[in-house]
């Protein structure tokens, strides 16, 4: 495998958009996965996803760990825009990077799951699509207007910092930032994981996204992880990665 760090997708004043990439040992173009870290949109670092990226690379995927801008310094839509721009950057430069431009996926957990789901359901008009070709959402929020049944203050505080406003101040922003309300027939195939004992992000969030995708005819699966909370055991995370690799291999072989 080849590891390249501090690659620049956007050279901009103050905050470059950087990514690290782990490439499999091959000379042919390969499918790719954008690995998006969690942290409530306000913390975390792309290096946290290196173990995940290594697993994908070992199985023939180029894995890109993105360092998106964090709130509250950079509120919505900064994080989503950064992830979308990386998709565009990879498609524009697919030949030189060594990846397939039509086999780009996103994988994320928690806040990263929200961003991965956003990449599956959202696009920006233009010649080059910013929507991924498949996504894996691991316990991500999908409806920011209704974050948590049991512990509302946990999620509300993170969301307010992420969006930069209270719900009653800018309801439309809270709706716009929610992947659930962007699902269409064109949304990318999505694999969703959620622990049934998650006390940070309500499992209903994932169930509702799955149901919305099923209603629109989007290829999707919902895997409930029995006995798992928001942080997974090693065995559960191995299952997540193995099933994600199988899912992407299946989608990209069509």
Residue ranges with predicted function:
Residues 1-254:
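Alpha/beta-hydrolase superfamily serine-hydrolase fold, recognizing
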């Amino acid at each position: 495998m080849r590891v390249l760090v501090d690659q620049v997708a956007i050279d901009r004043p103050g905050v470059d958009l950087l990514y690290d990439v782990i490439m499999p040992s091959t000379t042919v173009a390969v499918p790719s996965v954008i690995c998006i870290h969690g942290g409530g949109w306000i913390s975390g670092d792309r290096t946290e996803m290196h173990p995940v990226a290594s697993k994908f690379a070992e199985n023939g995927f180029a894995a890109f760990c993105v360092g998106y801008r964090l709130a509250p310094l950079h509120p919505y839509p900064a994080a989503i825009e950064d992830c979308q721009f990386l998709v565009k950057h990879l498609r524009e430069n697919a030949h030189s990077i060594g990846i397939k431009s039509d086999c780009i996926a996103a994988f994320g957990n928690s806040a990263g799951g929200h961003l991965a789901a956003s990449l599956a359901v959202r696009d920006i008009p233009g010649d080059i699509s910013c929507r991924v070709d498949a996504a894996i959402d691991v316990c991500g929020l999908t409806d920011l207007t209704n974050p948590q049944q049991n512990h509302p203050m946990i999620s509300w505080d993170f969301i307010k910092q992420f969006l930069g406003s209270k719900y009653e101040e800018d309801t439309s922003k809270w709706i716009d930032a929610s992947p659930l309300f962007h699902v269409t027939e064109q949304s990318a195939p999505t694999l969703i994981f959620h622990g049934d004992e998650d006390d940070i992000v309500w499992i209903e969030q994932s169930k509702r996204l799955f149901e919305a995708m099923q209603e629109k005819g989007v290829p999707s699966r919902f895997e409930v992880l029995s006995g798992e909370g928001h942080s997974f055991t090693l065995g559960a995370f191995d299952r997540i990665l193995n099933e994600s690799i199988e899912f992407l291999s299946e989608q990209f072989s069509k």
